[in-house]
Amino acid sequence: MTTLCAAASLALIPRSAHAWVESEVRSQVATVDVDRAGLAVVTEDLTLGVRGGPLPGFELSGVDLDAEPMPDATVSSVSGTKANVPLTPLLLDKRDDGTLRIEVDRDKGLRTGVYLFHFQYRTNLLKRDLIRREGSDVEVRWIGPRFTQGIDSARVVFRLPAGPTPPTLPDSGASIGRIDDGDALGG
């Protein structure tokens, strides 16, 4: 009788309570398109590996504090993986602490596989003092999101308005290019 009661009580537990999920960000490609007014559109392409599931969404911390999410955010499975998910909308919710909640707009969430998350947001780099004139040079800064579990591959592409000289990276000993604690916290 005890075994029967235990089996009956297990049957009453919702199936989702049995689920487990692991996820890891495998790569990030961020493209920062800056206009002459100092406004930028940041395009994020995150490759995320998922085991188990379902994964209904996740939080990304360290996004620009003034970020304004743009429409048409999507997720799709990466070709050649176990998952076969068509292009699916994402719901983005920017929080005041610089966290971006990314929800998959799909009842079943995401199960084991590798997925590409594509989303964009606007930010004002000039207003946040992340574009600075230093003599005849102009310095552009951008701090990307933080990945608490680490990341295998990260790349940032800056697209800047044309100028008289091509962009360069600052010398390692120069005062230009130094990052202070405010920048490390998202601005």
Where are these regions (language model features)?
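Bacterial N-terminal signal peptides
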Residues: T2-A11
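Lumenal/extracellular ectodomains and adaptor appendage modules
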Residues: P14-G187
